[in-house]
Amino acid sequence: MLSFAAALLAVTGCATYRFGSSVPEELRTISVPVFENDSGYPEIDAIVTQYVLREFQREGTFKIKDTKSSSLKLLGKLVKSDLTPLSYDRNYGSRASEYRYALVAEITLVERSTGKLLLDGVKIKANTTFLTHGDMLTGMQDAYPRIAKELSRSIVDAVLANW
């Protein structure tokens, strides 16, 4: 049994695993200007940007800096949004009572010192659902933080996957 454990240790010892981030130290500062918004929904750009910044802080690899002092700049644009009715309330005719909200962002990651594009126009999509309870605007506003959180996690994952 001891020889099996030693053999297993020898084999697994050959596997490479890094603790921490593989992002080079000189590239661990990032700026995230407010996302552009072509989604057709006002205010979602600021909310998504705020959640992306929070997610970078939570994840911990990058320090948030202003554009002039960061090594990387993440540019984002909300390029598409869709509302799809999922269920209807029979008491109010054919009015939808639940919707799926989809939001697509396009991100570009630039190494500021060289201008090199590390990510170029990568599209990332997030979805959430919401109930209208008779008020579409309130339902949408309630959905904004959920979709922003999901989208921000996918955006940060895409940036980290570059390394």
Describe the predicted segments one by one.
Residues 1-14:
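Sec-dependent bacterial lipoprotein signal peptides
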Residues 140-163:
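Compositionally biased, intrinsically disordered linkers/stalks adjacent to structured regions
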Residues 12-54, 58-69, 113, 123, ...:
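A structural "domain/chain start" motif
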Residues 36-41, 134-144:
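Second-shell loop/turn segments in exported
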Residues 18, 59-63, 69, 73-118, ...:
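Surface-exposed short loop/turn segments
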